Regions:
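N-terminal mitochondrial targeting presequence
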Residues: 1-24
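Active-site-adjacent loop/helix segments that line or gate small-molecule/cofactor pockets in enzymes
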Residues: 18-55, 103
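Conserved active-site and cofactor/substrate-binding residues in soluble primary-metabolism enzymes
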Residues: 27, 31, 54, 81, ...
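Active-site and channel-lining beta-strand-loop segments
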Residues: 49-71
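Short, well-ordered beta-strand elements within core beta-sheets of diverse protein domains
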Residues: 58, 78-79, 194-195
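Short beta-strand-to-turn element immediately C-terminal to the catalytic PLP-Schiff-base lysine
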Residues: 60, 79-80, 175-176
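Glycine-rich loop-to-alpha-helix module at the N-terminal edge of alpha/beta enzyme cores
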Residues: 66-152
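PLP-dependent aspartate aminotransferase-fold enzymes
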Residues: 114-215
């Protein structure tokens, strides 16, 4: 059986010149993996698959191998890849107005907020960039409600969290993680969290009985 290995030409740009590098499909993934290993801070350990393009529910790696995308961004983004309508909308907006600071209003944010609040049955919303940012803001909201409405003791607000949670990698979020790999060597951790087993209502009720500062 004869093995055909695809040759791929890559342009590498540095400060002084373009370098022309010839790679085969056999070592192309290794090339990109080694680049990340050499120049990236290793805060994550992804699968050794180097993706290059996507369409609909499918993705292809740099060697042309096809995959079903069952992860999407851990379900945070699930619109599929390169939907022509979305591509057109993104392109049109980028050609019209690319970015505005919250120091200004724009003609899209209010319409988005109206659509989202009516869709989910909320009164108001505060958009966030990431899940961890949303959790951080929820913590602030809960604490402020506790001080202004519930009248908990000053700077003593507590939040009950479940063991084995994962909500991100910011300093406060890892402070209520029970995973040593997420929080070791990052202390001192943010105080004010009470851990209980997931799914045990009696444990939650018991904490509310013991501590009047739970928000």
């Amino acid at each position: 059986m004869r093995l055909n290995i695809l040759k791929i030409t890559i342009f590498i740009f540095n400060q002084n010149s373009f370098k022309l590098i010839e790679k085969t499909s056999k070592d192309l993934s290794r090339y990109y993996l080694d680049l990340e290993k050499k120049y990236g801070a290793h805060d994550y350990h992804p699968l050794p698959v180097v993706l290059e393009k996507g369409e609909g529910v499918f993705m292809w790696d740099v060697n042309g191998k096809k995959y079903y995308d069952f992860l999407s961004a851990y379900s945070a983004v699930n619109q599929g890849h390169c939907h022509p309508e979305l591509v057109s909308l993104i392109k049109n907006q980028a050609e019209t107005l690319t970015l505005t600071s919250r120091a200004f209003h724009n003609n899209k944010l209010g319409e988005y907020m109206e659509f989202a609040t009516k869709l989910f049955g909320f009164d108001q919303l505060l958009p966030m960039n990431t899940g961890a940012e949303g959790v951080e803001t929820s913590i602030k909201l809960s604490r402020k409600w506790g001080y202004l409405k519930k009248k908990v003791d000053e700077n003593q607000a507590k939040i009950v969290v479940c063991n084995n949670n994962f909500h991100g990698r910011t300093t406060t979020v890892i402070s209520f993680s029970s995973d040593p790999g997420s929080k070791d060597f990052f202390g001192p951790h943010t105080p004010g969290f009470i851990h209980i087993p997931h799914g045990e209502i009696s444990a939650l009720e018991n904490e509310f009985k013991k501590d009047k500062n739970i928000v």
